[in-house]
Amino acid sequence: MRIIVADCCAEYTGRLSASLPLAKRVLLIKADNSLLIFSEIGSYKPLNWMLSPCTIKDITPQDADDDPATPTPEKIIRVQSTKTNDVLEVTLQHIYSDETHDLGTDPGLRKDGVEDHLQRYLAEQIERIGEGAKLVRREYPTAIGPVDIMAIDADGTHVAIEIKRHGGIDGVEQLTRYCELLNRDPLLAPVRGIFAAQTITPQAQVLAKDRGFDCLLLDYDDMKGTDDGALRLF
């Protein structure tokens, strides 16, 4: 990762045109040649950027110096997209710092409480959907994708469970498609559905009820064993 702190201005040309006036900013240049320009204030998003695949070229103008008072810039960085004619040209009028660091291989972001965790905990504690319930399997395969959990309730009825962190109408529609498909299989039918999530929107609750599904609110801390909160089935 190359990190440059500089007084700079920038021009983006191609499918759109944009410019940044001269100001002190931070430039990040990644190993894939992506370039991102950040300022001190504003959102987490860069002010301007060029993403990979692209080529990058450092240009040192003739008579370049590090005096910010002179009109000649220290360096120009030109980034060209390899798929389009888009070009981002950054003029570095004065460079305060230009350093390169090898960050190594990143293990990636590990999220806590996301759908995979919820699925695993609910599979391990399947009686939370009802006393006497038994797990068939996680990621139950179908022709249109895997159902998060397939179970059998105390009455011997198959139960398809769709799990979301935040449950909305799209999740209910997804569960509907699964149940419609599964109910065509005489070895499984009847299959009822449960829509499970940490939060469920009122609209999703109404739609789920209309489709004949139960809604299950998941308390992640309780399932993890760090709280005494209760799940609610309604």
UniProtKB/Swiss-Prot annotation:
The lineage of its organism: Bacteria, Bacillati, Actinomycetota, Actinomycetes, Bifidobacteriales. Signal peptide: none annotated. The gene is nucS. Its EC number is 3.1.-.-. InterPro entries: Endonuclease_NucS, NucS_C, NucS_N, NucS_N_sf, Restrct_endonuc-II-like, tRNA_endonuc-like_dom_sf. It is an enzyme of class 3 (hydrolase). It is found in: Cytoplasm. Gene3D superfamilies: 2.70.180.20, 3.40.1350.10. GO terms for molecular function: DNA binding; single-stranded DNA endodeoxyribonuclease activity. PANTHER family: ENDONUCLEASE NUCS (PTHR38814:SF1). Keywords: Cytoplasm, DNA-binding, Endonuclease, Hydrolase, Nuclease. Transmembrane segments: none annotated. Cleaves both 3' and 5' ssDNA extremities of branched DNA structures. This is Endonuclease NucS. GO terms for cellular component: cytoplasm. Belongs to the NucS endonuclease family.
